[in-house]
């Protein structure tokens, strides 16, 4: 599905960094060329060797690393990239990119890229809701970056709220939407209904069916991946189906 596609994963210093190893493995199984960039702080959460083992490519951390064939690496990689995902994106790196600061391999490469760029913030709720962080994210969106809203849940600091990075399966859908499917439904609005329906007989009894809703969810997801603005209306569903 992703053969001949170069996916750049830019990993910053966040506890959620370990989840990107799973995403890298998923992308590799889809035959993508997966390139991983890390900030120095990110290496405190996960070892670069993990990514090198999963992707078969050198994990780039140091701009001045001389242990590989010479090239202006951040420019060479930027030219090859089909999509860049910065995940988890710390408040620090979001601020750097939004204000044009490029002082390491990750930020210089992101600055040099002309492909689609996706940012997935991950941080404490108070940090995420800080007006400065929100202003930086809004600025990135004006510059054409796609921002994935963080999930709401229990955070590593012990708080519960917005700031949790979405699961790798969700991040994968954003990448696939950008590079793996034709955009023949761009500009279309698709409404899909899914799940078991009920027809009342009287205030107590009703007629229903055993629909799981999985087919409707699959159709909605396929439309979304092909560029449509998709909304799904769900009736009672006998099993849990996730839609991204």
Show which residues each predicted segment covers:
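A cross-family phosphate/adenosyl-ligand binding-site feature
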Residues: 1-118, 124-213, 217-244
